[in-house]
From Swiss-Prot:
<dbReference type="GO" id="GO:0050890">
    <property type="term" value="P:cognition"/>
</dbReference>
<dbReference type="GO" id="GO:0018279">
    <property type="term" value="P:protein N-linked glycosylation via asparagine"/>
</dbReference>
<keyword id="KW-0812">Transmembrane</keyword>
<feature type="topological domain" description="Cytoplasmic">
    <location>
        <begin position="218"/>
        <end position="221"/>
    </location>
</feature>
<dbReference type="GO" id="GO:0015693">
    <property type="term" value="P:magnesium ion transport"/>
</dbReference>
<dbReference type="InterPro" id="IPR021149">
    <property type="entry name" value="OligosaccharylTrfase_OST3/OST6"/>
</dbReference>
<feature type="transmembrane region" description="Helical">
    <location>
        <begin position="197"/>
        <end position="217"/>
    </location>
</feature>
<feature type="disulfide bond" description="Redox-active">
    <location>
        <begin position="99"/>
        <end position="102"/>
    </location>
</feature>
<keyword id="KW-1133">Transmembrane helix</keyword>
<protein>
    <recommendedName>
        <fullName>Dolichyl-diphosphooligosaccharide--protein glycosyltransferase subunit TUSC3</fullName>
    </recommendedName>
</protein>
<keyword id="KW-1015">Disulfide bond</keyword>
<keyword id="KW-0813">Transport</keyword>
<keyword id="KW-0460">Magnesium</keyword>
<dbReference type="GO" id="GO:0005739">
    <property type="term" value="C:mitochondrion"/>
</dbReference>
<comment type="similarity">
    <text>Belongs to the OST3/OST6 family.</text>
</comment>
<feature type="topological domain" description="Cytoplasmic">
    <location>
        <begin position="298"/>
        <end position="312"/>
    </location>
</feature>
<feature type="topological domain" description="Lumenal">
    <location>
        <begin position="243"/>
        <end position="276"/>
    </location>
</feature>
Length: 347
């Protein structure tokens, strides 16, 4: 039974082949060539990706941050394929640019990149690069970037979003803040290791030695410890430092000022109420000190029992200090809190 059925099945298959349309053979051949081409293209992408990752790992083994010009930026950051994330700092480190903020940000960026490079979690999923304005002007123009320094995250898939640009003006550029931002964008957690800094210890030792030496020299007469004026001056210095935002600067690590790399204009006052510069803290400290001095002079003019003419001059000087510097302080407040309706003398 099975021997008779075998020739019958072969005859039926032959009939099906005879009735197969002749136009289908080119289609099958084209489909076969397309599959071969797709397979070859995928293999080519894999080889290209492997070459890029190998090159990036080689650069990372030499330096934790590698510098890029326009061609390298387009090849390793913008062009596919990519299965890695890139953190790029756009800066202007050349001396003629006179960007002190760029140098400070570069130091923090270097600390962060070194912490990642020498950590046990280091892998080929995250790399750190840098584009200097004088080495990649075309990159700045391509990204419509008009300020430096700027930190951007380029994800492995898709285009960078708004949150992929680090808010340096509000948060500052401390390595710890950058590490937190990177963790939010890439899920890569970097523990920052800072090199030992003994300047604080040395300063504290000098201060203790100075105070100890002063107490030793004045050991027979310690009445100065009970001097109200001295303690009042110390208290005022602490109050001025805290009200000017020095603690915020210590935590956030903002730049001293901001210099526009195109026109060279330097800004000492931040335009937002959510951030400030170090220079801004110094300005506020001086203004508060001047207003306080004016108030002290007014009090002195009212309570002293000296010459009336002299007291009147002291009163006018104190009033002038309070009026002028308070008006200046209020104008800075209005520039940061847009829409604040009140002003005094200076707008």
């Amino acid at each position: 039974m099975s021997a008779r059925a075998a020739p019958s099945r072969r005859r039926q298959a032959g009939r099906r082949l005879r009735y197969l349309p002749t136009g289908s053979f080119p289609f099958l051949l084209l489909l076969l060539l397309l599959c071969i081409q797709l397979g070859g293209g995928q293999k080519k992408k894999e080889n290209l990706l492997a070459e890029k990752v190998e090159q990036l790992m080689e650069w990372s083994s030499r330096r934790s941050i590698f510098r890029m010009n326009g061609d390298k930026f387009r090849k390793f950051v913008k062009a596919p394929p990519r299965n890695y994330s890139m953190i790029v700092m756009f800066t202007a480190l050349q001396p003629q640019r006179q960007c002190s903020v760029c140098r400070q940000a570069n130091e923090e960026y270097q600390i962060l990149a070194n912490s990642w490079r020498y950590s046990s979690a280091f892998c080929n999923k995250l790399f750190f690069g840098m584009v200097d304005y004088d080495e990649g002007t075309d990159v700045f123009q391509q990204l419509n970037m008009n300020s430096a320094p700027t930190f951007m995250h380029f994800p492995s898939k898709g285009r960078p979003k708004r949150a992929d640009t680090f808010d340096l003006q509000r948060i500052g550029f401390a390595a710890e803040q950058l590490a937190k931002w990177i963790a939010d964008r890439t899920d890569v957690h970097i523990r920052v290791f800072r090199p030992p800094n003994y300047s604080g210890t040395i300063a504290l030792a000098l201060l203790v030695s100075l105070v100890g030496g002063l107490l030793y020299l004045r050991r027979n007469n310690l009445e100065f410890i009970y001097n109200k004026t001295g303690w009042a001056m110390v208290s005022l210095c602490i109050v001025f430092a805290m009200t000017s935002g020095q603690m915020w600067n210590h935590i956030r690590g903002p730049p001293y000022a901001h210099k526009n790399p195109h026109n060279g204009q330097v800004s000492y006052i931040h335009g937002s109420s959510q951030a400030q510069f170090v220079a801004e803290s110094h300005i506020i400290l001086v203004l508060n000190a001047a207003i306080t001095m004016g108030m002290v002079l007014l009090n002195e003019a009212a309570t002293s029992k000296g010459d009336v003419g002299k007291r009147r001059i002291i009163c006018l000087v104190g009033l002038g200090l309070v009026v002028f510097f308070f008006s200046f302080l209020l104008s800075i407040f209005r520039s940061k809190y847009h829409g604040y309706p009140y002003s005094f003398l200076i707008k």
